[in-house]
A protein has these predicted regions:
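Outer-membrane beta-barrel "beta-signal"
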Residues: 161-164, 168, 306-323
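Transmembrane beta-strands of outer-membrane beta-barrel pores
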Residues: 39-45, 74-78, 97-101, 114, ...
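Extracellular/periplasm-exposed beta-strand and loop segments of Gram-negative cell-envelope proteins
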Residues: 95-98, 133-141, 145-162, 193-202, ...
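Hydrophobic, aromatic-enriched interface-forming segments
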Residues: 159-229
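Solvent-exposed loop/turn segments connecting transmembrane beta-strands
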Residues: 60-67, 95-108, 114-117, 128, ...
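Transmembrane beta-strand segments that form the barrel wall of outer-membrane beta-barrel proteins
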Residues: 35-41, 55-56, 88-101, 105-108, ...
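Outer-membrane beta-barrel initiation region
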Residues: 23-83, 215-217
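Repeated loop/turn-to-beta-strand initiation elements of outer-membrane beta-barrel proteins
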Residues: 79-84, 116-120, 173-184, 229-237, ...
Protein backbone atom coordinates (compact mmCIF):
# COMPACT_ATOMS: atom_id res chain seq x y z
CA UNK A 1 0.00 0.00 0.00
CA UNK A 2 1.39 3.39 -0.93
CA UNK A 3 -0.02 6.84 -0.43
CA UNK A 4 0.51 9.21 -3.33
CA UNK A 5 0.31 12.94 -3.72
CA UNK A 6 -2.94 14.86 -3.93
CA UNK A 7 -1.48 18.03 -5.45
CA UNK A 8 -3.38 21.27 -5.57
CA UNK A 9 -6.01 19.77 -7.84
CA UNK A 10 -8.51 19.17 -5.08
CA UNK A 11 -7.83 22.56 -3.54
CA UNK A 12 -8.57 24.12 -6.92
CA UNK A 13 -11.81 22.18 -7.16
CA UNK A 14 -12.92 23.42 -3.78
CA UNK A 15 -11.92 27.02 -4.37
CA UNK A 16 -14.94 27.13 -6.65
CA UNK A 17 -16.88 27.74 -3.47
CA UNK A 18 -15.28 31.19 -3.34
CA UNK A 19 -15.62 31.74 -7.08
CA UNK A 20 -18.97 33.53 -6.87
CA UNK A 21 -18.11 37.20 -7.21
CA UNK A 22 -21.22 37.75 -9.30
CA UNK A 23 -23.53 36.77 -6.47
CA UNK A 24 -24.74 38.68 -3.44
CA UNK A 25 -23.03 37.48 -0.27
CA UNK A 26 -24.00 38.60 3.21
CA UNK A 27 -20.92 38.86 5.40
CA UNK A 28 -21.90 37.92 8.95
CA UNK A 29 -18.44 37.58 10.48
CA UNK A 30 -14.91 38.30 9.28
CA UNK A 31 -13.95 34.80 10.43
CA UNK A 32 -14.41 31.62 8.42
CA UNK A 33 -13.55 28.15 9.73
CA UNK A 34 -13.57 24.93 7.75
CA UNK A 35 -12.34 21.33 7.75
CA UNK A 36 -11.51 19.61 4.46
CA UNK A 37 -11.07 15.85 4.10
CA UNK A 38 -9.30 14.68 0.93
CA UNK A 39 -9.22 11.13 -0.42
CA UNK A 40 -7.79 9.71 -3.63
CA UNK A 41 -7.84 6.25 -5.22
CA UNK A 42 -5.21 5.28 -7.79
CA UNK A 43 -5.67 2.33 -10.18
CA UNK A 44 -2.61 0.62 -11.64
CA UNK A 45 -1.08 1.42 -15.04
CA UNK A 46 2.20 -0.34 -15.80
CA UNK A 47 4.97 1.70 -17.37
CA UNK A 48 5.51 1.24 -21.11
CA UNK A 49 8.78 2.15 -22.82
CA UNK A 50 8.93 4.19 -26.02
CA UNK A 51 7.83 7.48 -27.52
CA UNK A 52 4.62 9.32 -26.61
CA UNK A 53 1.75 6.86 -26.04
CA UNK A 54 -1.15 5.89 -23.76
CA UNK A 55 -0.62 3.36 -20.96
CA UNK A 56 -3.77 1.29 -20.30
CA UNK A 57 -5.02 0.20 -16.90
CA UNK A 58 -3.35 -3.03 -15.80
CA UNK A 59 -4.75 -3.44 -12.30
CA UNK A 60 -7.47 -2.27 -9.95
CA UNK A 61 -5.20 -0.84 -7.27
CA UNK A 62 -1.98 1.15 -7.08
CA UNK A 63 -2.46 3.32 -4.01
CA UNK A 64 -4.64 5.42 -1.72
CA UNK A 65 -4.18 8.80 -0.15
CA UNK A 66 -5.94 10.72 2.58
CA UNK A 67 -5.50 13.88 4.57
CA UNK A 68 -7.44 16.35 6.73
CA UNK A 69 -6.87 20.11 6.69
CA UNK A 70 -8.24 22.58 9.20
CA UNK A 71 -8.46 26.20 8.05
CA UNK A 72 -9.19 29.57 9.67
CA UNK A 73 -9.54 32.72 7.54
CA UNK A 74 -9.91 36.33 8.65
CA UNK A 75 -11.26 38.72 6.00
CA UNK A 76 -10.43 42.43 6.02
CA UNK A 77 -12.41 44.76 3.72
CA UNK A 78 -10.02 46.90 1.63
CA UNK A 79 -12.32 48.95 -0.65
CA UNK A 80 -10.46 50.91 -3.32
CA UNK A 81 -13.35 53.21 -4.18
CA UNK A 82 -17.13 53.51 -4.37
CA UNK A 83 -17.54 51.94 -7.81
CA UNK A 84 -18.96 48.40 -7.71
CA UNK A 85 -15.73 47.06 -9.21
CA UNK A 86 -13.69 48.63 -6.40
CA UNK A 87 -15.82 48.58 -3.26
CA UNK A 88 -15.67 44.80 -2.70
CA UNK A 89 -11.87 44.46 -2.43
CA UNK A 90 -10.77 42.21 0.44
CA UNK A 91 -7.65 40.87 2.12
CA UNK A 92 -7.83 37.32 3.49
CA UNK A 93 -5.40 35.98 6.10
CA UNK A 94 -5.47 32.19 6.42
CA UNK A 95 -3.87 29.68 8.75
CA UNK A 96 -4.01 25.95 8.01
CA UNK A 97 -2.97 22.69 9.59
CA UNK A 98 -2.72 19.63 7.33
CA UNK A 99 -2.49 16.16 8.87
CA UNK A 100 -2.01 12.88 7.01
CA UNK A 101 -1.09 9.41 8.33
CA UNK A 102 2.57 10.15 7.54
CA UNK A 103 2.97 13.92 7.95
CA UNK A 104 1.93 17.16 9.58
CA UNK A 105 2.22 20.57 7.90
CA UNK A 106 1.03 24.00 9.09
CA UNK A 107 0.71 26.83 6.55
CA UNK A 108 0.09 30.58 6.38
CA UNK A 109 -1.46 32.31 3.35
CA UNK A 110 -2.47 35.81 2.32
CA UNK A 111 -4.92 36.58 -0.49
CA UNK A 112 -5.80 39.99 -1.89
CA UNK A 113 -8.76 40.51 -4.23
CA UNK A 114 -8.46 44.10 -5.53
CA UNK A 115 -11.06 43.50 -8.26
CA UNK A 116 -13.76 40.83 -8.54
CA UNK A 117 -11.88 39.14 -11.39
CA UNK A 118 -8.28 39.41 -10.11
CA UNK A 119 -6.78 37.59 -7.10
CA UNK A 120 -3.20 37.69 -5.81
CA UNK A 121 -2.01 35.11 -3.27
CA UNK A 122 1.17 34.14 -1.47
CA UNK A 123 2.09 31.86 1.38
CA UNK A 124 4.35 29.29 2.89
CA UNK A 125 4.31 26.02 4.79
CA UNK A 126 6.71 23.83 6.73
CA UNK A 127 6.10 20.26 7.78
CA UNK A 128 7.70 17.01 8.74
CA UNK A 129 6.97 13.34 8.09
CA UNK A 130 7.58 9.86 9.43
CA UNK A 131 7.39 6.18 8.53
CA UNK A 132 4.10 4.48 9.39
CA UNK A 133 3.95 0.73 8.74
CA UNK A 134 6.24 1.06 5.74
CA UNK A 135 4.60 4.22 4.37
CA UNK A 136 7.41 6.76 4.10
CA UNK A 137 6.39 10.32 4.82
CA UNK A 138 9.85 11.86 4.38
CA UNK A 139 12.90 10.09 2.95
CA UNK A 140 16.08 10.44 0.87
CA UNK A 141 17.08 8.22 -2.07
CA UNK A 142 19.74 5.71 -1.05
CA UNK A 143 23.12 5.74 -2.80
CA UNK A 144 22.30 2.55 -4.71
CA UNK A 145 19.13 4.18 -6.09
CA UNK A 146 17.00 1.18 -5.13
CA UNK A 147 15.30 2.40 -1.94
CA UNK A 148 14.55 5.47 0.17
CA UNK A 149 16.09 6.01 3.59
CA UNK A 150 13.80 7.56 6.19
CA UNK A 151 14.72 11.00 7.51
CA UNK A 152 14.33 11.95 11.15
CA UNK A 153 10.95 13.53 11.99
CA UNK A 154 11.32 17.07 13.37
CA UNK A 155 14.98 16.90 12.36
CA UNK A 156 14.31 17.48 8.67
CA UNK A 157 11.52 19.67 7.33
CA UNK A 158 9.60 20.01 4.09
CA UNK A 159 9.45 23.73 3.21
CA UNK A 160 7.35 25.32 0.48
CA UNK A 161 6.51 28.90 -0.49
CA UNK A 162 4.41 30.20 -3.37
CA UNK A 163 3.16 33.35 -5.08
CA UNK A 164 0.39 33.36 -7.66
CA UNK A 165 -2.06 35.42 -9.65
CA UNK A 166 -5.56 34.36 -10.70
CA UNK A 167 -7.97 35.70 -13.30
CA UNK A 168 -11.60 34.62 -12.83
CA UNK A 169 -14.81 35.52 -14.61
CA UNK A 170 -18.46 34.50 -14.31
CA UNK A 171 -20.93 35.44 -17.06
CA UNK A 172 -23.53 35.77 -14.30
CA UNK A 173 -21.84 39.08 -13.46
CA UNK A 174 -23.20 40.61 -16.68
CA UNK A 175 -26.17 38.35 -17.49
CA UNK A 176 -28.60 37.98 -14.59
CA UNK A 177 -30.18 34.60 -13.88
CA UNK A 178 -29.73 31.32 -12.03
CA UNK A 179 -28.66 29.49 -15.20
CA UNK A 180 -26.25 32.03 -16.69
CA UNK A 181 -23.10 31.17 -14.74
CA UNK A 182 -20.42 30.05 -17.19
CA UNK A 183 -17.14 30.36 -15.33
CA UNK A 184 -13.47 30.57 -16.22
CA UNK A 185 -10.49 30.70 -13.88
CA UNK A 186 -6.78 30.74 -14.77
CA UNK A 187 -3.95 30.65 -12.22
CA UNK A 188 -0.20 30.95 -12.65
CA UNK A 189 1.85 30.00 -9.60
CA UNK A 190 5.57 30.19 -8.88
CA UNK A 191 6.66 27.98 -6.01
CA UNK A 192 9.68 26.42 -4.39
CA UNK A 193 9.80 23.22 -2.37
CA UNK A 194 12.70 21.59 -0.58
CA UNK A 195 13.76 19.33 2.26
CA UNK A 196 16.07 21.04 4.75
CA UNK A 197 19.55 19.55 4.94
CA UNK A 198 19.21 17.90 1.52
CA UNK A 199 21.55 19.03 -1.26
CA UNK A 200 20.27 20.21 -4.63
CA UNK A 201 19.89 17.40 -7.22
CA UNK A 202 19.50 14.84 -4.42
CA UNK A 203 16.29 12.86 -4.93
CA UNK A 204 13.84 12.72 -2.03
CA UNK A 205 10.33 11.65 -1.08
CA UNK A 206 7.51 13.52 0.66
CA UNK A 207 4.17 11.97 1.70
CA UNK A 208 5.14 8.79 -0.19
CA UNK A 209 5.56 10.73 -3.44
CA UNK A 210 9.12 10.27 -4.68
CA UNK A 211 11.50 11.45 -7.41
CA UNK A 212 11.49 14.99 -6.02
CA UNK A 213 14.38 17.45 -5.86
CA UNK A 214 14.80 20.93 -4.39
CA UNK A 215 14.02 23.74 -6.79
CA UNK A 216 11.92 26.55 -8.19
CA UNK A 217 8.86 25.34 -10.12
CA UNK A 218 5.74 26.63 -11.81
CA UNK A 219 2.14 25.45 -11.71
CA UNK A 220 -0.71 26.56 -13.95
CA UNK A 221 -4.37 25.61 -13.98
CA UNK A 222 -7.32 26.49 -16.16
CA UNK A 223 -10.88 25.81 -15.01
CA UNK A 224 -13.90 25.93 -17.32
CA UNK A 225 -17.14 25.31 -15.43
CA UNK A 226 -20.88 25.80 -15.40
CA UNK A 227 -22.76 26.59 -12.17
CA UNK A 228 -26.35 25.50 -11.55
CA UNK A 229 -28.92 26.13 -8.78
CA UNK A 230 -29.00 22.40 -7.95
CA UNK A 231 -27.38 20.06 -5.46
CA UNK A 232 -25.03 19.24 -8.33
CA UNK A 233 -23.98 22.86 -8.30
CA UNK A 234 -21.03 22.87 -10.69
CA UNK A 235 -19.54 20.76 -13.50
CA UNK A 236 -16.47 21.48 -15.54
CA UNK A 237 -12.95 20.57 -16.60
CA UNK A 238 -9.69 21.34 -14.81
CA UNK A 239 -6.43 21.43 -16.79
CA UNK A 240 -3.09 21.61 -14.96
CA UNK A 241 0.53 22.05 -16.07
CA UNK A 242 3.50 21.76 -13.71
CA UNK A 243 7.28 21.78 -14.22
CA UNK A 244 10.69 22.81 -12.92
CA UNK A 245 12.25 25.98 -14.32
CA UNK A 246 15.80 24.61 -14.05
CA UNK A 247 16.82 22.24 -16.85
CA UNK A 248 19.53 20.89 -14.53
CA UNK A 249 17.37 20.35 -11.44
CA UNK A 250 18.16 16.61 -11.60
CA UNK A 251 21.68 15.18 -11.76
CA UNK A 252 20.87 13.02 -14.81
CA UNK A 253 20.67 15.35 -17.86
CA UNK A 254 18.77 12.67 -19.84
CA UNK A 255 15.88 12.62 -17.35
CA UNK A 256 14.54 15.96 -18.71
CA UNK A 257 14.33 18.05 -15.55
CA UNK A 258 11.92 20.61 -17.05
CA UNK A 259 9.36 18.01 -18.19
CA UNK A 260 5.86 19.50 -18.13
CA UNK A 261 3.39 17.29 -16.32
CA UNK A 262 -0.11 17.78 -17.72
CA UNK A 263 -3.36 16.70 -16.04
CA UNK A 264 -6.90 16.95 -17.42
CA UNK A 265 -9.70 16.29 -14.93
CA UNK A 266 -13.47 16.36 -15.44
CA UNK A 267 -14.98 17.56 -12.18
CA UNK A 268 -18.24 17.93 -10.33
CA UNK A 269 -19.14 19.83 -7.18
CA UNK A 270 -22.11 19.06 -4.96
CA UNK A 271 -23.41 21.68 -2.52
CA UNK A 272 -25.66 19.97 0.02
CA UNK A 273 -26.27 22.96 2.30
CA UNK A 274 -24.48 26.06 3.56
CA UNK A 275 -22.04 23.89 5.52
CA UNK A 276 -21.28 20.87 3.33
CA UNK A 277 -19.79 20.57 -0.16
CA UNK A 278 -18.14 17.73 -2.07
CA UNK A 279 -15.79 17.97 -5.06
CA UNK A 280 -15.10 14.92 -7.26
CA UNK A 281 -12.35 14.73 -9.87
CA UNK A 282 -11.45 11.99 -12.37
CA UNK A 283 -7.88 12.69 -13.43
CA UNK A 284 -6.04 11.80 -16.65
CA UNK A 285 -2.34 12.68 -16.43
CA UNK A 286 0.98 12.53 -18.22
CA UNK A 287 4.29 11.22 -16.93
CA UNK A 288 7.70 10.68 -18.46
CA UNK A 289 8.19 7.79 -20.86
CA UNK A 290 11.65 6.25 -21.19
CA UNK A 291 13.71 4.41 -23.79
CA UNK A 292 13.98 1.28 -21.64
CA UNK A 293 11.48 -0.77 -19.65
CA UNK A 294 11.20 -0.35 -15.90
CA UNK A 295 8.89 -1.58 -13.15
CA UNK A 296 9.11 0.97 -10.33
CA UNK A 297 9.11 4.77 -10.32
CA UNK A 298 12.20 4.80 -8.08
CA UNK A 299 14.26 3.71 -11.12
CA UNK A 300 13.26 6.64 -13.29
CA UNK A 301 15.73 9.39 -12.39
CA UNK A 302 18.54 7.21 -13.83
CA UNK A 303 16.74 6.57 -17.15
CA UNK A 304 16.61 8.36 -20.52
CA UNK A 305 13.48 10.39 -21.34
CA UNK A 306 11.78 9.61 -24.66
CA UNK A 307 8.32 11.23 -24.57
CA UNK A 308 4.96 11.48 -22.80
CA UNK A 309 3.05 8.58 -21.29
CA UNK A 310 -0.66 9.31 -20.78
CA UNK A 311 -2.68 7.30 -18.28
CA UNK A 312 -5.75 7.40 -16.06
CA UNK A 313 -4.30 8.60 -12.77
CA UNK A 314 -6.97 8.70 -10.07
CA UNK A 315 -10.39 9.43 -8.69
CA UNK A 316 -10.25 12.10 -5.99
CA UNK A 317 -12.85 13.36 -3.53
CA UNK A 318 -12.71 16.38 -1.23
CA UNK A 319 -15.35 17.06 1.41
CA UNK A 320 -15.45 20.50 3.05
CA UNK A 321 -17.41 21.38 6.14
CA UNK A 322 -17.70 25.12 6.80
CA UNK A 323 -18.67 26.21 10.30
Amino acid sequence: MCFKKIITTIAVGLCFTAFVFSQEVEVVSPWNFSITTDFAYYPKSDYVAGNTHFAPLTGAYSGLEGRVTGSATYTIPTPLGEHWLLNSATLDLTGELEVSPVSIKPALKIKWTPLPFIVFSAGGSAGTGWNLAGLQGMAELAEDGKSYNDLKPFGTYFVKWFAQGTFQFDTGAVIAGDWTHFQIMYTYQVYSEMLTGIKNQTVWEWQCSGNKVNGLQNYQNLVLAYQMPLTLSRVGVLTEIESHYNKKAYLNPLYKSDFKKISISPLAQFTFDEHNSLAILAGFSSRRSFTTDHKESIEETALTYSGYEWFFNRIALSWTYTF
